[in-house]
Amino acid sequence: ATCRKLASRARTHIQAARPRFPVSREQGQEIAAAFFAASRFGDMERLRALLAEGVTAHADGGGKVPASLHPLAGIDAVLERHAQLAAEFARAPSKLVRYAFFDGLPGFVTIEAGEIVQLTALEIDGDKISAIYVMRNPDKLRHLGLGSPGNRAGRRQA
């Protein structure tokens, strides 16, 4: 059983195709800050420069808060979604709580419209963002110590 589990984990790691060497904390924080600013202020040119061509975006609302139902794949799909979100951020700006690392990935915690707590983690390969992970599921965010995340309707995220 132990051997099968090790083999299963190895296959999962290979299929994930994650970068072999993690980004430095300093570089990760710089990229996370640049991504936050570009995505919140609708700077699509800067956002394009930060994203890898094959970037993917995943969101988890746990069925309790709005989130994209399917992953986005490719730079054009991710940019299109972030252009939509930038218009929403202009009406209801995100409140940045802090930058941090989550499971080794740089990112940030925000409070979105409807008092929804959101964690965004960025997988970085070289100097480009290869994957965006957005966690909005309140059950999985309780450990952040930000009180009770809101469950009211908010906007969908990428």
Please report, for each region that a protein language model flagged, where it lies by residue.
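Low-complexity, glycine/alanine/valine/leucine- and proline-rich hydrophobic stretches
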Residues: 76-158
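Solvent-exposed, charged amphipathic helical/linker segments at domain boundaries
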Residues: 2-84
